[in-house]
From Swiss-Prot:
The chain crosses the membrane at residues 102-122, 130-150, 163-183, 190-210, 222-242, 276-296, 320-340, 354-374, 378-398, 422-442, 463-483. Keywords: Cell membrane, Endosome, Lipid transport, Membrane, Transmembrane, Transmembrane helix, Transport. This is Sphingosine-1-phosphate transporter SPNS2. One of its GO terms (molecular function) is sphingolipid transporter activity. The gene is spns2. Lipid transporter that specifically mediates export of sphingosine-1-phosphate (sphing-4-enine 1-phosphate, S1P) and sphinganine-1-phosphate.
Length: 513
């Protein structure tokens, strides 16, 4: 060939050469090209054709990761509420009163909320899936060990629940932020709905697993040996299959100090009010989840439909029914909450906090009716529990999604940790013990009888619906500032798909599924 390149991709004839067919074959509309530039074009074309494959593989990996993270969340709550499923047996075995039994959950939550901000700080700065798996392995080992504690060492069981709380804090704090970075917009809402459905599902399975395993094995200790085995398996899968997701647009955002992050979150009014609302949800779910099965058992003793249990193993019927109701209402609540929010977004941009507020206020009505119905009809009480829990659970995924909307990516783990801390501090850290303490206080002022054991616990639990109404007010306050805070965060909100350039469209998100 008789061609020369000038070094920038244009080709000219050498002196004395006559253009031939080969040269004419390389002509293009804008001019001529040399073989080198053709190779570059071919490489670029090959790269662009492989880009959709990489994007598809990334999306599949993201969906799989969200599934594994959701399974891990199920196990966290299964382990947490296994104790509640065998609470009556624990009371009989260690010979503790209502306040002592409530202390198990209170110590767990206290250690959980203290550890949450620490893991939030670590989650914004270090490898998140390593922290998650380490936390799972830790609480699995502690839970398994606690099943061998002798009768005279109740304080060791209390201490072990505190250590389990530290391990589970790592998961609940960091896992939602990984999902928040893997998905955007409606897809993120869907994936967070699946993740937070794990809360009622795991809670219900905790009651069912605890009571069923105890019934089969004839010993409540075996109930504490199921979740650790599953935890080790899940922790291993998490290490292998969950990708190391980028923290939103963290590589292009300037890092900030922890103090600056905290100041930014405290000034975020939507975040503050939604965190206070979440605290009321935690208060109610912590108290009701701990005491409702025992309350309904005492109601049946008063109605003389069951005999009092003085020596374990005791009846597991109420724990099984309550666990099944919790699983079903959690599923319905998450679906109803996500569906109602999606529909209401067509009407108003403040749909998220408004749907939560309506759910809370409606839930308070049915929770009140539980204590009225339980005096005469257990079936009616279960119906009210079903309706109240469905409405109460409808806001979990929505609240998490609101946080992702109003908080910038580099602060999300810290935001989740701080929200977890405040919700537990003001919520279920004290509510199980507080309800037990009030119940004991009322019993001390009356004659000891099955009737007053039932009534005292019911009077104490009546605190819950009033707290739930307060939560509805906080969600209404969130609606006032939601749009302004979301707009501020969206200025720094990136597309979480590393293979997409520019903004993510809803059609692109839909292709993930």
């Amino acid at each position: 060939m008789c061609l020369e390149s000038d070094g920038v991709g244009t080709v000219s004839n050498s002196q004395g050469c006559i253009p031939g067919a080969e040269e004419r074959g390389l002509e293009t509309l804008p001019g001529r090209m040399n073989p080198t530039s053709l190779d570059v074009k071919a490489v670029e074309l090959e790269s662009s054709s492989s880009k959709p494959d990489k994007a598809y593989n990334w999306k599949r990996a993201s969906v799989a990761a969200a599934g594994i993270l959701s399974v891990g969340n199920v196990l966290n709550y299964l382990d947490r509420y296994t104790v509640a499923g065998v609470l009556l047996d624990i009371q009989q075995h260690f010979e503790v009163k209502d306040s002592g039994a409530g202390l198990l959950q209170t110590v767990f939550i206290c250690s959980f909320m203290v550890a949450a901000p620490i893991f939030g700080y670590l989650g914004d700065r270090f490898n998140r899936k390593v922290i998650l798996s380490s936390g799972i392995f830790f609480w699995s080992a502690i839970t398994f060990s606690s099943s061998f504690i002798p009768k005279k060492y109740f304080w060791l069981l209390v201490l072990s629940r505190g250590l389990v709380g530290i391990g589970e804090a790592s998961y609940s704090t960091i896992a939602p932020t990984i999902i928040g970075d893997l998905f955007t917009k409606n897809t993120r809402t869907l994936m967070l709905s699946v993740f937070y459905f794990a809360i009622p599902l795991g809670s219900g399975l905790g009651y069912i697993t605890g009571s069923s395993v105890k019934q089969v094995a004839g010993d409540w200790r075996w109930a504490l040996r199921v979740s650790p085995v599953l935890g080790v398996i899940t922790g291993t899968l998490l290490l292998i299959f969950v990708p190391t997701a980028k923290r939103g647009h963290a590589e292009q955002l300037k890092g900030s100090s922890w103090i600056r992050d905290m100041r930014g979150l405290i000034k975020n009014r939507s975040y503050v009010f939604s965190s206070l609302a979440t605290s009321t949800v935690s208060f109610a779910t912590g108290a009701l989840g701990m005491w409702i099965p025992l309350y309904l058992y005492r109601a049946q003793v008063v109605q003389k439909s069951v005999e009092p249990c003085n020596i374990p193993p005791c009846s597991t019927k109420d724990s099984l029914i309550f666990g099944a109701i919790t699983c079903l209402t959690g599923f319905l609540g998450v679906i109803i909450g996500a569906g109602a929010t999606k529909w209401c977004r067509r009407k108003t941009q403040r749909a998220d906090p408004l749907v939560c507020a309506v759910g809370m206020l409606g839930s308070a009505i049915f929770i009140c009716l539980v204590f009225v119905a339980a005096k005469s009809s257990i079936i009616a009480a279960y119906i009210c529990i079903f309706a109240g829990e469905t409405l109460l659970f409808s806001n979990w995924a929505i609240t998490a999604d609101m946080l992702m909307y109003v908080v910038i990516p580099t602060r999300r783990a810290t935001a989740v940790a701080l929200q977890s801390f405040t919700s537990h501090l003001l919520g279920d850290a004290g509510s199980p013990y507080l309800i037990g303490f009030i119940s004991d206080l009322i019993q001390q002022s009356t004659t000891k009888s099955s009737l007053w054991e039932f009534l005292s616990l019911g009077y104490a639990l009546m605190l819950c619906p009033f707290v739930v109404v307060l939560g509805g007010m906080f969600f209404l306050a969130t609606a006032l500032f939601f749009l302004e805070d979301r707009e501020k965060a969206e200025k720094l909100e990136p597309c979480s798909d590393p293979f997409t350039v520019g903004n993510c469209s809803d059609s692109e998100e839909a292709s993930i599924l």
